[in-house]
Amino acid sequence: MQHLFEKLFRAESMSQEESQQLFAAIVRGELDPSQLAAVLISMKVRGETPAEIAGAAQALLADAQHFPRPDYLFADIVGTGGDGTNSINISTASAFVAASCGVKVAKHGNRSVSSRSGSSDLLAAFGIRLDMSAEQSRLALDDLGVCFLFAPQYHTGFRHAMPVRQQLKTRTLFNVLGPLINPARPPLALIGVYSPELVLPIAQTLKVLGYQRAAVVHGGGMDEVAIHAPTQVAELNNGSIESYQLTPEDFGLNRYPLAALQGGMPEENRDILARLLQGKGETAHAAAVAANVALLLKLYGQENLRHNAQQALEMIHSGQAFDRVTALAARG
């Protein structure tokens, strides 16, 4: 292990295998706090490479609790958090709407990073159990088209890094790992990142990790597809990556100010999204979810973004998406 420390302190990059070896030791609790802090800061200052991020993700996936992976096509829709916008839970709402559109979503998430209420805070407010077993979650995915995998339940090794992360009070590699370590190992993913500089590196990381098709997005300061500004996209499709920009108009949607997506505490967000998913919500909220669902549906081969957004809006207005929420809560 010492030779890897020396390599990092010389500002040299690790190979994917070296990174996997190092992070396997981290999740086993084999590094003391000062060593872990030194590793994370040296990587942050130099800038983590896609190979290093992929190696770290593979170490955490190897250490994760088993999830019975289905043989059908399914996706994750998840953001890094940490964008500081305190918006409503767009990706969580999008998962339920996408399921209502007929695709399968195994959403990996955690408690809040950037907003006052992360995806699991919101789901708990809806009465959805966070400690559902892997088998129960798989059945929900089969039957309802949506399940939620609570990160701390599957990634117990994360706890070894938590005290150091809290003391450092700065973003580290762990801030981008969350979306990459879904224990269900989805072949498709829509991943939002907190910085435009991360869009291409995370897409390159997804390629290394073997994703079939994925899109990494950052829109006007948000780790989502934006409806107030252009969205930067890096799309991975069978090994090749294409970078492009999307505007709300590409989805056939109007623009809305970022302030229109302001969220609140978990109970407030629950009420906002309950109204939205029952077809009684704000038009800006519906548009934001429709844009994200539209890009997710594209990963399934539905290439027409305007058509996809319209399909999502129709599903939102029908109130069918909320039926998935109540059905998932009823499985508690």
Swiss-Prot record:
Residues reported in the UniProt entry to bind anthranilate 2: R165
Binding site for 5-phospho-alpha-D-ribose 1-diphosphate: 79, 82-83, 87, 89-92, 107-115, 119
SUPFAM superfamilies: Nucleoside phosphorylase/phosphoribosyltransferase catalytic domain, Nucleoside phosphorylase/phosphoribosyltransferase N-terminal domain
Entries under InterPro entries matching the protein: Anthranilate_Pribosyl_Tfrase, Glycosyl_Trfase_fam3, Glycosyl_Trfase_fam3_N_dom, Glycosyl_Trfase_fam3_N_dom_sf, Nuc_phospho_transferase
Pathway(s) where this gene product acts: Amino-acid biosynthesis; L-tryptophan biosynthesis; L-tryptophan from chorismate: step 2/5
Cofactor: Mg(2+)
Residues holding Mg(2+) 1: S91, E224
Cofactor notes: Binds 2 magnesium ions per monomer.
Biological process annotations from GO: L-tryptophan biosynthetic process
Catalytic reaction annotation: N-(5-phospho-beta-D-ribosyl)anthranilate + diphosphate = 5-phospho-alpha-D-ribose 1-diphosphate + anthranilate
Binding of anthranilate 1, residues: G79, N110
Subunit record text: Homodimer.
Chain's role: Catalyzes the transfer of the phosphoribosyl group of 5-phosphorylribose-1-pyrophosphate (PRPP) to anthranilate to yield N-(5'-phosphoribosyl)-anthranilate (PRA).
Protein name: Anthranilate phosphoribosyltransferase
Origin species: Yersinia pseudotuberculosis serotype O:3 (strain YPIII)
